[in-house]
Amino acid sequence: MKRIAVLTSGGDAPGMNAAIRAVVRKAISEGMEVYGINRGYAGMVDGDIFPLGSKEVGDKISRGGTFLYSARYPEFAQLEGQLAGIEQLKKHGIEGVVVIGGDGSYHGAMRLTEHGFPAVGIPGTIDNDIAGTDYTIGFDTAVNTAVEAIDKLRDTSSSHGRTFVVEVMGRNAGDIALWAGIASGADQIIVPEEEFDIEKVASTIQYDFEHKGKNHHIIVLAEGVMSGEAFAQKLKEAGDKSDLRVTNLGHILRGGSPTARDRVIASWMGSHAVELLKDGKGGLAVGIHNEELVESPILGTAEEGALFSLTEEGKIIVNNPHKARLDFAALNRSLSQ
């Protein structure tokens, strides 16, 4: 394989640029040419494809976001979109593709491989919700950004004797909430993976104020549960009498210079993705498990270790969905006594 391409797709995540840099420089060291694709699969279909060299990725390792831009392009799920993208790949002499993104991005990589264009997926999302890896690129940075913000909110919360509900991203996964909540000393953490009793949450706030001598209370809420405003309304309906404020950290968690950990795992996975393509392997996703590099088939059976399977009706299902560490939820409860 002499010429490959790299793209980023879906939501941006700190560390994507580090992964792009690794793909480009590793490929060049192996005697391969690299092309960048702007705006993910949308750019592939539009032919927004251009050469990338070492100079183009210089000084990118410390930058957040993705300099290749990103976009969601549901049309690529259809055969017409796939064939249009493949036509552009052929036009530019591209033989393989590295795809950095989440589940939807992996589905595109799977389709490319089926059409004879080996594609390798790299997990890039702050949500840390992709099967086949313990950590995704961007997660560590997002957690650190959340902790910094919660630490600052604690200052104002304690100054005014208030309760703060801090909503964090994560889609349907509670990883950011759990890790940031523990690291910031949150009083309560609410995640989608665990049922909660709103009346117990309210009574815990009251008990902390009246019997523990606390003058403030921090609740970290994963967005997959409900919005912070809706949660606050339910708290009041459950009898909470505290001076309550809501802060949604929102997209700030996607930005910022990536942490050292995100830069390292992005570089590690990007380099390995190139090695796989060099060997002509596609339809695989790179990941980290027990601090070691792993690779999994994107499509296949659960017994084969594949991330996704197809039902008889042609529906894509996740074989081993990512699960947040609920032992961390128990840990935080024991530490917030």
UniProtKB/Swiss-Prot annotation:
Its EC number is 2.7.1.11. It is found in: Cytoplasm. One of its GO terms (molecular function) is monosaccharide binding. The active site is at D127. It catalyses: beta-D-fructose 6-phosphate + ATP = beta-D-fructose 1,6-bisphosphate + ADP + H(+). Its main location: cytoplasm. Its cofactor is Mg(2+). GO terms for biological process: canonical glycolysis; fructose 1,6-bisphosphate metabolic process; fructose 6-phosphate metabolic process. The keyword Kinase applies. Allosterically activated by ADP and other diphosphonucleosides, and allosterically inhibited by phosphoenolpyruvate. It is an enzyme of class 2 (transferase). Mg(2+) binds at D103. Keywords: Allosteric enzyme, ATP-binding, Cytoplasm, Glycolysis, Kinase, Magnesium, Metal-binding, Nucleotide-binding, Transferase. ADP binds at R21, A22, V23, V24, R25, R154, G185, A186, D187, K212, K214, N215, H216. ATP binds at G11, R72, Y73, G102, D103, G104, S105. Pathway: Carbohydrate degradation; glycolysis; D-glyceraldehyde 3-phosphate and glycerone phosphate from D-glucose: step 3/4. Substrate binds at T125, I126, D127, R162, M169, G170, R171, E223, R245, H251, I252, L253, R254. GO terms for cellular component: 6-phosphofructokinase complex. Gene3D superfamilies: 3.40.50.450, Phosphofructokinase domain. Catalyzes the phosphorylation of D-fructose 6-phosphate to fructose 1,6-bisphosphate by ATP, the first committing step of glycolysis. PANTHER family: ATP-DEPENDENT 6-PHOSPHOFRUCTOKINASE (PTHR13697:SF4), PHOSPHOFRUCTOKINASE (PTHR13697). Belongs to the phosphofructokinase type A (PFKA) family. ATP-dependent PFK group I subfamily. Prokaryotic clade 'B1' sub-subfamily. This is ATP-dependent 6-phosphofructokinase.
